[in-house]
A protein has these predicted regions:
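Short, low-complexity disordered leader/linker segments with a strong preference
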Residues: 1-38, 111-118, 348-354
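Hinge/beta->alpha junction and helix N-cap segments in small-molecule ligand-binding domains
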Residues: 42-55, 70-80, 101-102, 125, ...
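Signal peptide-proximal N-terminal region
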Residues: 56-71, 186-190
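Extracellular/periplasmic ligand-binding modules, especially the Venus flytrap/periplasmic-binding
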Residues: 225-237, 267-268, 274, 278-299
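Short acidic/histidine-rich motifs immediately flanking catalytic phosphotransfer sites
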Residues: 88-95, 118, 216-220
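Bacterial carbohydrate/catabolite-sensing allosteric modules
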Residues: 135-221, 239-253, 269-270, 294, ...
Length: 354
């Protein structure tokens, strides 16, 4: 989930404290045991609530799994990711978890780590090429499908919607965009989709949404491919007089992806209508779980797991554990055959964080 700008909330403050106390930007360790295997985790960015939540979860899970931890932050820069990998190598880590935002440019770094027999687990993104021990992410095509089915149901198969696309140079942006478009063409051909490239930039998303609403005031739906666009979307709708209660005919139905606390609050308040909860907590947990498994010499095969997910083979030699990511709505209803959970459900990580 490549993102640039997003909400700053309590989770951000907690993440900053966690970085200072537990991480130290590449020099900190969350476990001091000399017997604990040393692993490196590169955080992809710290400018969004989702990734700041992931950052706060990581040290705790490392401790639970008996791992000693070194961390870096590549700040959405593949050159920094490459440099951080070199730092980890010099520190003698036994495995590395990373979330490469440029899924093509990371290939040389993966090749170097493979040559040094350092296993890699990628989180949220799947490299376009190169070898990793496991990819830990949710089914991002399902994100686009679920958003489509929700909006298609709410609009009764007719009308106009704006899709604020993520970066199409990332597998996540491509998966969500293609799946949403495919679903609309297949299931709701009466809905016109305005696809807007934003490169995960909230300011760009807000500007393009404003332009679309000015030219097409009858737009009744917005699909934000992540919470990077939440603040800007709400601001634009408010300026246009469209931030109305769901029962009001002026209401514009909004679906997001991430499941951050602010999204859940916005659903409860009637400001947005749905999100897909991307599991920040489970990303942290299973990234480290698979690193420890790699260090211990374990192997895996495609199939169901013991944690309500499915491992698939995406290409020869590359496995992906697709974690559960539910549709979240106010009423917990079923939309276009897609079940949802209520926004106040205590099982959602966004209701137990911050």
């Amino acid at each position: 989930m490549r993102l640039r700008t997003a909400l700053r909330s309590t989770a951000s403050a907690l993440a900053a404290l966690a970085l200072l106390s537990a991480c130290g930007s590449g020099t900190g360790a969350s476990s001091a045991s000399g017997d604990a295997p040393l692993v490196g985790v590169d955080y992809p960015r710290s400018d969004t609530d989702f990734w700041n939540s992931y950052i706060t979860y990581t040290p705790g899970y490392a401790g639970q799994l008996g791992l000693s931890l070194k961390t870096t932050n590549s700040q959405n820069d593949v050159a920094k990711l490459t440099a951080n990998a070199q730092t980890f190598i010099s520190q003698g880590v036994k495995g590395i978890a990373m979330a490469p935002q440029d899924t093509a440019a990371v290939a040389p770094t993966l090749a170097q780590l493979e040559a040094k027999k350092i296993p890699v687990v990628t989180i949220d993104t799947r490299p376009d090429s190169g070898k990793v021990f496991m990819v830990v992410r949710a089914d991002n095509r399902a994100y686009g499908e679920k958003a489509c089915q929700f909006l298609g149901t709410k609009l009764k198969g007719e009308g106009k919607v704006v899709m604020l696309e993520g970066g199409l140079d990332s597998i996540n942006g491509r998966d969500r965009t293609e799946a949403f478009n495919d679903c609309m063409k297949r299931s709701y051909p009466g809905i016109k989709v305005f696809g807007e490239a934003t490169n995960w930039d909230g300011a760009v998303a807000a500007q393009k949404l404003q332009t679309d609403l000015t030219a097409n005031p009858d737009i009744k739906g917005v699909y934000m491919q992540s919470s990077f666009a939440l603040a800007g979307t709400l601001q634009v709708l408010k300026q246009k007089g469209l931030l109305a209660d769901p029962s009001d005919e002026k209401h514009v139905f909004v679906v997001s992806n991430d499941g951050i606390p602010e999204e859940l609050k916005s659903i409860a308040a009637g400001k947005i209508d749905a999100t897909v909860s991307q599991p920040a907590d489970l990303y942290a947990k299973y990234a480290l779980h698979y690193l420890k498994a790699a260090i211990d010499g374990k192997t895996f095969q495609p199939g169901k797991t013991d944690h309500d997910s499915t491992i698939i083979q995406v290409r020869p030699g590359l496995l992906e554990d697709q974690l559960s990511a539910p549709l979240v709505t106010l009423d917990g209803g079923t939309y276009g055959g897609v079940p949802s959970v209520k926004s106040d459900d205590p099982s959602l990580w966004g209701n137990n964080h911050g």
